[in-house]
Amino acid sequence: MTTEMQEIAITEEKPLLPGQSDAVKDAEIAARILLDQGQEHTVETPHGVLHVTVHGSGNARRPAILTIHDVGMDSKSCFSTLFRFEEMQEIVKNFTVVHIDAPGQEEGAAVYPAGYQYASMDQVSEMLPAVLQFFNFRTIIGVGVGAGAYILSRFTLNNPEAVEGLVLVNVDPNARGWMDWAAHKLSNLTSSLSDQIISHLFSQQELSANTELIQTHRERITKAPNLLNIELFWKSYLGRRDLSLDRNNTFKCPVMLVVGDQAPYEEAAVECNSKLDPTTTSFLKMADAGGMPQLTQPSKLTEAFKYFIQGMGYMASSCMTRLSRSRTTSLSSSYSMEGSRSRSRTLSQGSQGGQLPPSPSNTMEVSC
């Protein structure tokens, strides 16, 4: 059975008044610039200091959106493309957004001395409660990529009451096996640090094409003044412990797993999905996204993120302004309901008055 898609016209929430003064416009522009820059803080934790950037004035009734980046990146290079994306503004204007840089990874970070004992992945996750306490955040929605996804996963398992939702991009819940360990030892002999990290971040197809994005990140890593810090973070991630996820030891909140088709951690994400509660987990496998979907497909990830937040009870469907106006999009998906049966369904933003796709009560696999 097919459903006819209809175009929905929605007016601006706050249309510009004809007589609005230039002074008001200038004040709005100045406020927008300040919001884009964010407020930077240094937060003391039991395992050292963290560099934290906060955007937005805060809403005590809603969780903060808290992000942690991957190895070889900082919060800006990992998340600016996504969170500055035009359609994402419909989301971020309703939440406080908090970007955490892993120890020593922020732009301009001092280089650690030789022999410095870098924090383990578990210890980095233990630094997060101090951040929540510093800003008086009661709960968060975590958004992590790669190593950041692992850190947020560990934090959520240890502090389930503090996390209302998780978006995990390229998550690998497993510790390295002997084969991985041997492969890394061989890689150390034949590949530079930047090559190892680039292979961690991007798919083989992207590496073969040597895209401009890869060239930019390779140059940034190679020329980074804090290259030693990056290496320490990389080694810490390689030494991570197994999260030991299973249906009896899993997240208590809605989770959205995201991975690019043919991405380095595609198999790990699929395995992680099999270990989570199917009634609270959504799984998105994004075509043509490569290893960094937040950089290559910000529009599709924004769309999925908004549905995820709406499924949690925030931002009702009536708030769909830019996302509804910009285009009518159909997503083909297959999902299992209560683990007992599966079916196919076409999800449309613009049909039937803006009906939403399945909430986090379903496991959904989407090829965008």
Swiss-Prot record:
GO biological-process terms attached to the record: cell differentiation; nervous system development; signal transduction; Wnt signaling pathway
Keyword Cell division applies: no
Main location: cytoplasm
Protein name: Protein NDRG2
Location(s) in or outside the cell: Cytoplasm
Functional note: Contributes to the regulation of the Wnt signaling pathway. Down-regulates CTNNB1-mediated transcriptional activation of target genes. May be involved in neuron differentiation.
InterPro entries: AB_hydrolase_fold, NDRG
Family label: Belongs to the NDRG family.
Alphabetical list of SUPFAM superfamilies matching this protein: alpha/beta-Hydrolases (SSF53474)
Record's compositionally biased regions (Low complexity): 330-339
Organism: Danio rerio
